[in-house]
């Protein structure tokens, strides 16, 4: 009760929370021969921590798939030429981390360990097997090669050893023993002045989530995970960093713009919001203390919406009732959604207008400032919308980023109108029918029938081989 009163007094003015964190790497660390091997099989710890394990397992109940491209086909155009134009689902329970990265069309249909479109780094937030491999191979060894190389090795879903030092005496005694299991994340926290071993308990809780719930990119020939925080964590800081190193994730196939793809920057947006500024952590809102059948308190590992545990989350600080807070959150979510759609409409036109300019004979020099505006507009839009909980974490920052994106998109279209006029084009550039996901994918030349068929063959033939090999090697219990 005393803790609740203290927290209520401390955070009385707060209204929203929803997610997590990040990092930045320097030299990669070699593997240590002295450390105990990471145990990646989550069920190993079920007898020792039964309540935590069963609640973690309950994330499998969060099974619904929401197709973001079907909901908003504009995204297909904005990501033309990038795997996200094939497939993009909203997030679901941690229990599906490995399943979803295998099944997404973005990872392709590799036949061999050296095949496929994506690097090993795409496993990095999916499994405690990642921590095990980094420990065994070192970071250079882990990151080397294609995504398919990790198939027989990375088989256990995101779980215990991702967040806890499961080999420690503290963990054996029932204490949290939270840790940063990804060395690149630990270095990143140090880079922004937050060394994990010197951080307070509340900061450490959010840092653990921030190993994955952050913006990142794949750096260098080895495609190692790096967080773009060298200049700071605001959208403009990261944009400046990426521009300085001339980095792009891909080139939009319509406009030929060198693009940036934001990932899931929950830590950055949470840090910018009222909850982050008042040290209300990811755990406070998404993993509250609850009671088991015997009345013992434990941390609920069924990570989810704070409103699902209102009495143990929001009500610890807020005096408003659940319905009142839900109404406020819904209004902010709608405001962000409305501006998001307006920005997307401008960007869709900009990509097709840029294509028309190229087709009309525009030069690289003429297009450079236009493409820069498109790049910056879409980056700011993407960083806002890729953080699915931004309406909870930092609604004001979300609207600010989207407003800035709208301005940049308008600048691009104004310059395009002037350039097109010099090429004798004064009429509006028509758009193809992109009213559905399927029509939008057809408009950018995707053969979805072939892509889906190849994926299904991969799931039927390659994935079972991975699992058989993992069982033979003792990496899977069943």
Curated annotation (Swiss-Prot):
Chief localisation class: periplasm
> Which residues of the sequence carry a binding annotation for heme?
122, 125-126
Q: Which gene encodes it?
A: nrfA
Q: Which cofactor does it need?
A: Ca(2+); heme c
Cellular localization per UniProt = Periplasm
Q: Which NCBIfam families match?
A: cyto_c552_HCOOH (TIGR03152), PRK11125.1 (NF008339)
Question: Which EC class heads this enzyme's classification?
Answer: oxidoreductase
* Catalytic activity annotation: 6 Fe(III)-[cytochrome c] + NH4(+) + 2 H2O = 6 Fe(II)-[cytochrome c] + nitrite + 8 H(+)
Identify the residues that bind substrate.
216, 264
What protein name applies here?
Answer: Cytochrome c-552
Q: Which organism is it from?
A: Salmonella typhi
Q: How is the cofactor bound?
A: Binds 1 Ca(2+) ion per monomer.
Molecular function GO labels: calcium ion binding; heme binding; iron ion binding; nitrite reductase (cytochrome, ammonia-forming) activity
User: Would I find DNA damage among this entry's keywords?
Assistant: no
Q: Where does heme c 3 bind?
A: 94, 209, 212-213
Tell me which Gene3D superfamilies the record gives: Butyryl-CoA Dehydrogenase, subunit A, domain 3, Flavocytochrome C3, Chain A
């Amino acid at each position: 009760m005393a803790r609740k009163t203290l927290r209520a007094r401390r955070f009385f003015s707060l209204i929203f929370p929803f997610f997590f964190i990040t990092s930045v790497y320097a030299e990669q660390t070699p593997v240590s021969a002295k450390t105990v091997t990471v145990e990646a099989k989550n069920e190993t710890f079920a007898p020792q921590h039964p309540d935590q394990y069963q609640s973690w397992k309950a994330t499998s109940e969060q099974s619904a798939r929401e197709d973001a491209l079907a909901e908003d086909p504009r995204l297909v155009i904005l990501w033309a030429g990038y795997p996200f134009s094939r497939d993009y689902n909203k997030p679901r329970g941690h229990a599906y981390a490995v399943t979803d990265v295998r099944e997404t069309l973005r990872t392709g249909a590799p036949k061999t360990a050296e095949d496929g479109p994506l690097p090993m780094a795409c496993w990095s937030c999916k499994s405690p097997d990642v921590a095990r491999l980094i420990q065994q191979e070192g970071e250079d060894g882990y990151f080397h090669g294609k995504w398919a190389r990790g198939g027989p090795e990375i088989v256990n879903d995101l779980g215990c050893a991702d967040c806890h030092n499961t080999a420690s005496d503290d963990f054996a005694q029932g204490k949290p023993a939270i840790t940063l299991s990804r060395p690149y994340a630990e270095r990143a926290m140090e880079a922004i002045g937050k060394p994990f071993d010197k951080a307070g308990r509340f900061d450490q809780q959010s840092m653990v989530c921030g190993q994955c719930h952050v913006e990142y990119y794949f750096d260098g020939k080895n495609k190692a995970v790096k967080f773009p925080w060298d200049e700071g964590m605001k959208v403009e800081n990261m944009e400046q960093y990426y521009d300085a190193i001339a980095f792009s994730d891909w080139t939009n196939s319509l406009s030929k713009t060198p693009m940036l793809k934001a990932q899931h920057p929950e830590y950055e947006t949470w840090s910018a919001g009222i909850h982050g500024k008042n040290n209300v952590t990811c755990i406070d809102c998404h993993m509250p203390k609850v009671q088991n059948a015997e009345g013992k308190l434990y941390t609920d590992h069924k990570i989810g919406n704070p409103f699902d545990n209102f009495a143990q989350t929001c009500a610890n600080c807020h005096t408003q009732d659940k319905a009142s807070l839900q109404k406020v959150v819904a209004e902010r979510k709608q405001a962000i959604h409305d501006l998001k759609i307006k920005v997307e409409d401008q960007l869709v036109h900009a990509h097709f207008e840029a294509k028309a300019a190229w087709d009309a004979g525009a030069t690289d020099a003429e297009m450079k400032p236009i493409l820069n505006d498109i790049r910056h507009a879409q980056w700011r839009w993407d960083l806002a919308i890729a953080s699915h909980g931004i309406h909870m974490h930092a609604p004001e920052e979300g609207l600010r980023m989207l407003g800035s994106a709208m301005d940049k998109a308008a600048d691009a279209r104004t310059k395009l109108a002037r350039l097109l006029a010099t090429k004798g084009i004064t009429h509006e550039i028509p758009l193809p029918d992109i009213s559905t996901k399927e029509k939008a994918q057809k408009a950018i030349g995707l053969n979805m029938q072939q892509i889906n068929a190849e994926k299904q063959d991969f799931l039927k033939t390659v994935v079972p081989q991975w699992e058989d090999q993992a069982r033979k090697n003792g990496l899977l219990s069943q």
